[in-house]
Amino acid sequence: DLVKEIIRKYALFFIQKGLTINLHDLDVKVVSDEKWLLVIIEQVLSNSLKYTKSGGIEIYFKDNGLHLKDSGIGIKNSDILRVFERGFSGYNGRLTQQSSGLGLYLSKKIADQLGHDISISSQVGQGTTVSIHFQKQKLAID
């Protein structure tokens, strides 16, 4: 429901850019702070929309993680290691002057505080996948 809520919020951007959205395997429940998780997902989706000119975005849950995969311009390998640094704008962000270098930095900080892990894989010209992995909750019953 949280992902669908965010998609509704950004629906006009998908329509204006002619991008597709593919949601699947999202019928899961995770233990997290909804407000802060929303901030992370919105930031990642906003980046995907900003750097995807054609094709679309796929959002799915697999291996205890939420994955946002786009068909955008991708991130250079030399930039991948630094995307979570405060104030860092990769080559594409500097080229288009659309990046403050704070969004992914803040997303990483929030994810860390929530006990989640956020990672990025990307290929220039192929797109980017951002993954938010959730800690498996262990419940003890006395």
Predicted regions and their residues:
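Conserved micro-motifs of the catalytic ATP-binding
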Residues: 25, 29-33
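Short helix-loop "hinge" at the ATP-lid/N-box region of the Bergerat-fold HATPase_c
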Residues: 48-49
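Short beta-strand/loop element within the Bergerat-fold HATPase_c
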Residues: 54-65
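Acidic ATP/Mg2+-coordinating residue in the GHKL
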Residues: 70
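Short conserved segment of the HATPase_c
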Residues: 75-88
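Short alpha-helical Gxxx[C/S/T] motif in the catalytic ATP-binding
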Residues: 103, 107
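Conserved glycine-rich
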Residues: 115-116
